[in-house]
């Protein structure tokens, strides 16, 4: 806002929780490589997990059925210390119990995807950001995309985040958890998300069978569905399976809605706190000309 720079399709926004679909794909790539199995214990790769979390599986992290508490609840609101993915096991170690027995319930938690970034690093032998670049962004031509690390990487055409304070928009671009990558640390552009969406439809990165599993609601131990797959909320619409996700972090609010049977994908990226891009995406999808 300070420079009145215009947003373009190449402008990079922080994805917040839209990042989770990329983290999930990284895990699936490693499963296809034979470096891990989706039903492995997470502790195989993250041995520093607290004792109460040592029976949690990678699948349960992917589907928010682990019962693990959200690490953000252990971060003091006025903290200026930057939390990283590697700090998450210690943060959840401040507690001593799961919210529910793993696999028996659903509870959306950023903890799972921060831990999955550690799983990716240790299974691949590469930093999480480098793995994303080499296995996802570069092969798909996503030249504006990066899992941003301050002092390590840069964001090519970066939109900074803003919040409305006392009637004025002020820059509120980073919080104490902004350095956590697995749950929300990717910056990308609309141009790059077109490449991503085409790759999903064409099964360029993972097999059709694995993609189908990612787009299927997880099932709890009592047979109930959760409405969440691997990095996507999943529900039914008149046109078939509907995939969606909302992302919100300091200064950014985003939404994605995808209906594969209609070959329809709607993405809204905003560099502001608040607003309701998910509602707008749903209203766009309902337009008569797009049905």
Predicted regions: what they are:
Residues 2-4, 88-99, 163-178:
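The feature captures the short pre-catalytic strand/loop hairpin that immediately precedes
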Residues 9, 14-18, 30-74, 95-97, ...:
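Active-site helix/loop module of the DD-peptidase/beta-lactamase fold
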Residues 9-14, 100-104, 177-179, 243:
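Short pre-catalytic strand/loop immediately N-terminal to key active-site residues, enriched for Gly-Thr
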């Amino acid at each position: 806002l300070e420079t009145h720079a215009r947003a373009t399709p190449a402008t990079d926004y922080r994805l917040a929780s839209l990042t989770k679909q990329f983290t999930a794909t990284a895990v699936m790539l490693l499963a296809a490589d034979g470096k891990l199995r989706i039903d492995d214990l997470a502790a195989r790769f993250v041995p520093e997990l607290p004792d109460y979390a040592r029976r949690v599986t990678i699948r349960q992290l992917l589907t928010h059925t682990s019962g693990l508490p959200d690490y953000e609840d252990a971060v003091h609101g006025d903290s200026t210390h930057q939390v990283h993915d590697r700090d998450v096991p210690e943060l959840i170690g401040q507690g001593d119990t799961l919210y529910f027995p793993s696999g028996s319930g659903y509870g959306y938690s950023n903890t799972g995807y921060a831990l999955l970034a550690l799983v990716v690093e240790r299974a691949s032998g590469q930093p999480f950001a480098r793995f994303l670049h080499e296995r996802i962004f570069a092969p798909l031509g996503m030249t504006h995309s990066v899992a941003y690390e301050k002092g390590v990487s840069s964001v090519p055409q970066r939109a900074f985040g803003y919040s409305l304070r006392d009637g004025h928009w002020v820059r509120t671009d980073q919080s104490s958890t902004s350095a956590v990558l697995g749950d929300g640390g990717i910056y990308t552009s609309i141009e790059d998300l077109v490449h991503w969406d085409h790759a999903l439809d064409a099964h360029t990165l993972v097999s059709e069978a694995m993609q189908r599993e990612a787009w299927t609601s997880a099932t709890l131990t009592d047979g109930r569905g959760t409405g969440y797959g691997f990095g996507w909320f999943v529900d039914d619409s008149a046109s078939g399976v509907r995939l969606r996700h909302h992302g919100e972090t300091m200064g950014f609010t985003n939404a994605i809605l995808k209906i594969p049977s209609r070959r329809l994908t709607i993405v809204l990226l905003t560099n502001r706190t608040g607003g309701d891009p998910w509602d707008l995406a749903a209203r766009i999808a309902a337009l008569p000309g797009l049905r």
